[in-house]
Amino acid sequence: CYGKSLPNGKTYKQEMLEKIPLDLSRVHFVGSLPYGLYLKVIQASDVHIYLTRPFVLSWSMIESLSTGCLIVGSDTSPVREVIEDGENGLLADFFSPKQVADRVDEVLEHPTRMAEIREKARQTVLERYALSDMLGKHLELINQVANRTLTPTIGRETKPSLTLSKF
């Protein structure tokens, strides 16, 4: 979806299935879905595994949180901006498949214990990312950039008057 095509012409799914033996009765490749059906899949999921290197945070993580789907995410800066380990999701070392698997096991083995984390995940989105709040802030940011009134912050110690991290 985001990367280059493989030089051998295979899809990443084909490449992975050739290298990793998976129980396909337990792993679902749903492909592209209409938005309403996509949300139903997330709502039916026990866990959303979100691994990313330092990059921009994907909307899929915020949407998963909004449905109360529990996130096991990589302990990387974009994920830590949203997930507080043990509060509204779980973090694992990006470079440790065992730690990721252990965190997923923790979710699946203790569904009752995870209920509060799921609720806090949803609350995080309602409190910090609600469209009714974000729209005005985004328009303000656009106006500041367009009018050149946004204080430059690169290389400065002071905090800007408006940043996306506040949202």
Language model features: what each stretch is:
Residues Q99, E106, R113-E127, M134-E140:
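A short, well-ordered alpha-helix in the C-terminal region of glycosyltransferases
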Residues L131-F167:
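C-terminal alpha-helical cap of glycosyltransferases
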Residues R53:
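Aromatic "clamp/platform" in nucleotide-sugar-dependent glycosyltransferases that forms part
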Residues L70-G73:
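Short hydrophobic beta-strand element within catalytic cores of glycosyltransferases
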Residues L39, S58-S66, R80-E81, E87:
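Short alpha-helical segment that forms part of, or immediately flanks, the ligand-binding pocket
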Residues K13-L33:
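Nucleotide-activated donor-binding/catalytic signature segment of Leloir-type glycosyltransferases, i.e.
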Residues S32, K40-S45:
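Short alpha-helical donor nucleotide-sugar binding micro-motif in glycosyltransferases
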Residues D85-G86, L90-P97, E106-P111:
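Conserved acidic donor-binding segment of nucleotide-sugar-dependent glycosyltransferases
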